């Protein structure tokens, strides 16, 4: 999949990196890995400027999918890099607490080699990747990694979530199909849990053009969205522009 070119804003408010401080190259980089050898790929804008701090999007994989399959499934690379994001795609590993903690190290590893604005780290993923997205956001050892999350088709329901304490208010965009037969109804349950954690009103507003409802009056002005699609469990929702819009509207991770 091709990377896009972005338009940089050069102003005094733009976070920067010292010239020569980040060795990562522009475009397509494959075969990066964590300390425990979780492979991941990195995509930057074609005209990547290593002195400008970029938002980072980490896209976690569904069960059985590798990083290349995740990139193909989501189709995020071209649009995200064209909008100035750096994107990382890790392989899937069977989820466990140690694996989730390892997956949560990827943003810091990317930031060692590429110029990343560490207040603008965003997580998304499909199925197990959505579960990883949720878990990294609420687990005690990994919360604070992300400025906003957008899990899709995640296998996390109200019973699971009841075992965990809430993180600080966090922008969340839950995507789930009403036709998901693997995790039926899980997305709506997860959205209600996040809305309660974010101290929103309990009744969401009307659906927008993407099928999303927003829980109003959340703490700290964060957004809490539930977006209900009609595809199968394995289908990535056709709303990449809306996901990227959501991420662009939110920065500054909450510890």
Predicted stretch roles:
Residues 59-62, 89, 174:
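Structural cue for short, hydrophobic secondary-structure segments
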Residues 69-88:
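Short amphipathic alpha-helix adjacent to the substrate-entry channel of hydrolases
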Residues 1-54, 126-150, 156, 204-217, ...:
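A domain-start/cap signature at the N-terminus of enzymes
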Residues 173-175, 182-188, 197-255:
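C-terminal catalytic histidine-bearing segment of alpha/beta-hydrolase fold enzymes
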Residues 115-127:
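Alpha/beta-hydrolase fold nucleophile elbow
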Residues 51-63:
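Short beta-strand element of the alpha/beta-hydrolase
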Residues 95-118, 135:
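Alpha/beta-hydrolase active-site loop
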Residues 92, 149-157, 177-179:
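Active-site nucleophile loop of the alpha/beta-hydrolase fold
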């Amino acid at each position: 999949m091709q990377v896009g070119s972005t338009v940089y804003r050069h102003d005094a408010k733009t976070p920067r990196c010292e010239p020569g401080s980040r060795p990562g190259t522009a475009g397509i980089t494959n075969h990066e890995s964590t300390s425990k050898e979780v492979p991941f790929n990195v995509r930057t804008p074609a005209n990547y400027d290593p002195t400008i701090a970029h938002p980072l999007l980490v896209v976690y994989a569904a069960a059985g999918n590798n990083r290349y399959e995740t990139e193909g499934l989501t189709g995020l690379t071209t649009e995200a890099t064209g909008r100035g994001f750096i994107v990382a795609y890790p392989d899937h590993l069977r989820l466990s607490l140690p694996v989730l903690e390892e997956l949560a190290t990827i943003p810091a590893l990317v930031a060692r080699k590429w110029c990343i604005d560490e207040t603008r780290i965003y997580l998304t993923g499909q199925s197990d990747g959505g579960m990883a997205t949720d878990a990294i956001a609420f687990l005690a050892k990994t919360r604070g990694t992300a400025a906003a999350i957008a899990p899709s088709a995640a296998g996390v329901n109200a019973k699971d979530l009841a075992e965990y304490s809430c993180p600080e208010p966090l922008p969340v965009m839950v995507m789930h199909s009403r036709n998901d037969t693997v995790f039926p109804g899980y997305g709506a349950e997860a959205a209600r849990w996040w809305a309660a954690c974010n101290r929103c009103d309990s009744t969401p507003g009307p659906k927008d053009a993407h099928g999303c409802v927003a829980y109003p009056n959340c703490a700290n002005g964060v957004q809490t969205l539930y977006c209900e699609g009609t595809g199968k469990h394995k289908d990535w929702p056709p709303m990449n522009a809306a996901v990227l819009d959501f991420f662009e509207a939110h920065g500054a991770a909450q510890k």
